[in-house]
Regions:
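Conserved mid-domain beta->alpha element of the FAD-binding
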Residues: 1-22, 136-137, 196, 230-232, ...
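Conserved protein kinase catalytic core
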Residues: 25-26, 145-146, 282-284
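Flavin-dependent oxidoreductases
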Residues: 165-198
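Long, positively charged, glycine-interspersed low-complexity recognition regions
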Residues: 50, 130-131, 304-367
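Short glycine/proline- and charge-enriched loop/turn segments
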Residues: 19-22, 72-79, 213-218, 334, ...
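Conserved N-terminal helical subregion
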Residues: 9-11, 34-170, 215-233, 365-367
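FAD/FMN-dependent oxidoreductases across multiple families
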Residues: 178, 190-192, 198-206, 212-286
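Accessory recognition modules or surfaces
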Residues: 20, 25-36
């Protein structure tokens, strides 16, 4: 949502952002910004600032979880932009600070929308309303806009959970003194994995996220639950001692069910359009979920610039036509959890430039 707002604002559109949270906070943890996404931050005018925040690994490394042997290594240096890993909250703050503060509206939980031939009205739970020409639903896997378009459909549990934790301060220093830590690494063993990387330029914060297939869990409607170190030890008992040391050094550990949704028959309806997880949620196993949302935002902006706001319907059609194949491919590979498990060429992911891609007008147009 922040990317879409920034890009549309920079393109001259009058943009208001409605956020249900009462204020901005540094939530979340690590996120990858590949070269394909950094090119969009370049367009936003935020590339250098973002680069200064994150760690820039030379390569992505895959290791055998039992013995630490390298299974694959992919350089990320030759794709026309930097690859960084950074704290999600720091990246979001950079985007938010680029927006007109008078156009940011917090504490706005959407209740409903009403379309007319001339505009669309948003109704919020606090009793206020807002009117716009179009509404971009960048509201995640539990998207209210998606629900309005297609009806209530609970997310589908994928059969996987993710443990997440940060390592900082003296615990990180002690860990690093005893074990070599890769800048960005994914550990694989049997049916589970653990990805670890730094989230700051100073390398003073190390983050890991796992993928584990347990039985279905009941979160009581919450996005995540607190976990305990013993659960991590149990889940990764067969992993290398370096992983055991990382678990011991972890601060609070949380556990998140990974949910999916069925593919959408349409990405827009009337004056409403979806992007990102609201449209094509995926498991985080390629670290490209947010990336696909940001590419969506860039293509949607291009199509609205090309067609004009008055021709929003045509712009939405072009946007879906030019994004669906790539988003679906990334979604499929990510959900299969096979990316870089063995040596392969990742240029189809990182070498992509959403601004260099010609806009297709029909299915038959060659890319």
């Amino acid at each position: 949502g922040g990317a879409a707002a920034c890009l549309l604002q920079n393109a001259g559109f009058d943009v208001d952002v409605y956020e249900q949270a009462p204020e901005f906070s540094r939530i979340g943890a690590g996120i990858h910004v590949g070269p394909n996404i950094m090119k969009v931050f370049r367009e936003m005018g935020l590339e250098q600032q973002l680069e200064a925040m994150g760690c820039d690994p030379d390569a992505l490394i895959s290791r055998d979880g039992s013995n630490a042997e390298v299974m694959a290594e992919a350089s990320v240096r030759d794709y026309g932009a930097t690859y960084i890993t950074v704290h999600r909250g720091d990246m979001h703050l950079l985007q938010v600070q680029s927006l007109d503060p008078q156009k940011l509206h917090y504490g706005k939980q959407l209740l409903n929308v009403e379309q007319t031939p001339d505009d669309v009205t948003l109704y919020f739970t606090d009793g206020t309303t807002a009117t716009a020409d179009i509404v971009v639903g960048a509201d995640g896997i539990n998207s209210k806009i998606r629900e309005i378009l297609l009806g209530v459909e609970p997310p589908l549990y994928s059969g996987w959970v993710a443990h997440r934790a940060l390592i900082r301060g003296e615990k990180l220093e002690k860990l690093r003194a005893e074990h070599p830590l890769d800048d960005c690494v994914k550990w694989w063993h049997k049916d589970r994995h653990l990805m670890a990387y730094y989230t700051t330029r100073e390398r003073d914060e190390y983050y890991y996220v796992t993928g584990v297939p347990p039985e279905e869990m009941d979160t009581g409607g919450r996005s995540f639950l607190e976990s305990v170190h013993q659960a991590m030890y149990d889940a990764f008992a067969e992993f290398h001692p370096r992983i055991q040391a990382m678990i011991a050094a972890s601060e609070d550990i949380t556990i998140w069910p990974l949910n999916n949704r069925n593919p959408l028959p349409v990405w827009s309806d009337g004056r409403l359009v979806l992007l990102g997880d609201a449209c094509h949620p995926m498991k985080p196993h390629m670290a490209q979920g947010a990336g696909m949302a940001i590419e969506d935002a860039a293509m949607l902006t291009r199509c609205l610039q090309l067609e004009g706001l008055e021709n929003y319907s045509s712009a939405f059609r072009l946007y879906e036509l030019n994004r669906k194949d790539r988003a679906t491919r990334v979604q499929s590979v990510s959900n299969a959890n096979s990316f870089l498990k063995a040596q392969e060429d990742p240029s189809w992911v990182y070498g992509y430039d959403v601004y260099a891609a010609p806009i297709r007008h029909t299915e038959e147009d060659n890319v």
